[in-house]
Amino acid sequence: MQIIHTIEELRQALAPARQQGKKIGFVPTMGYLHKGHLELVRRARVENDVTLVSIFVNPLQFGANEDLGRYPRDLERDAGLLHDAQVDYLFAPTVSDMYPRPMQTVVDVPPLGNQIEGEARPGHFAGVATVVSKLFNIVGPDAAYFGEKDFQQLVIIRRMVDDMAIPVRIVGVETVREDDGLACSSRNVYLTPEQRRAAIIVPQALDEADRLYRSGMDDPDALEAAIRTFIGRQPLAVPEVIAIRDPETLERLPALQGRPILVALFVRVGATRLLDNRVIGHAAPQITQERAA
């Protein structure tokens, strides 16, 4: 595996693969890799000739009071995992490599980016869309892989690619979970043992939402209230966002009527904000399927 730190070096390294018509699979990450990231890598390796992973903690997507400074970083550890996973290239630029001067160009996708998580984190998804579009311009991948745990991000990236006619296939990969159901996340490392035990309430709340919906609870406000009450049984968990939305448009739904719905949860356990999502209903929506841009 070749580790690359600059944009020019990466472009030079990928040039032979392009000349030979090889397919490039790209997995953008912020590092501190876990089983979910490695599943994205596995899919990329299976479906492409060349696999490239980026590790970049993007300051544009962090608010003033968020965890940019303490976000877990261990490039040596991550490089070892990617080497074992038979990745071809690791792109690990610095902030000055990616943003040599203050950015004046911003990619935003309202109203998708202003809803759900965007309501609590203004500007977050503009930062995500900006860095992902820049990475796509640098890498020029044939396919890029994103986890469905960050479902809103996946919807936004798909829309950005469609709107901007970026020639990359966006592949959503099912959420990878720990044995007890907690979604794999780099931020899980923040949890104390007691908090880690309490965090299981998050996937359990999604199970409860699925059960209630299938049993006939068709009012979105009632379903949100029931989920909030369920999470409230765990004193260490504070529900910050409970959203019932259309899984393609992220719009609020006046009535559910048995259709597929997105249940999005943001739950704070201690100082750690945990994110999880699930699409429930009678059929999977189109947005969770792979499609070409």
From Swiss-Prot:
GO MF terms listed in the record are: ATP binding; pantoate-beta-alanine ligase activity
* UniProt KW keywords: ATP-binding, Cytoplasm, Ligase, Nucleotide-binding, Pantothenate biosynthesis
Q: Which residues bind (R)-pantoate?
A: 61, 153
- The active site is formed by 37 (proton donor)
Name the domain of life.
Answer: Bacteria
Q: What's the subunit arrangement here?
A: Homodimer.
Q: What is this protein called?
A: Pantothenate synthetase
Organism (species): Brucella abortus (strain 2308)
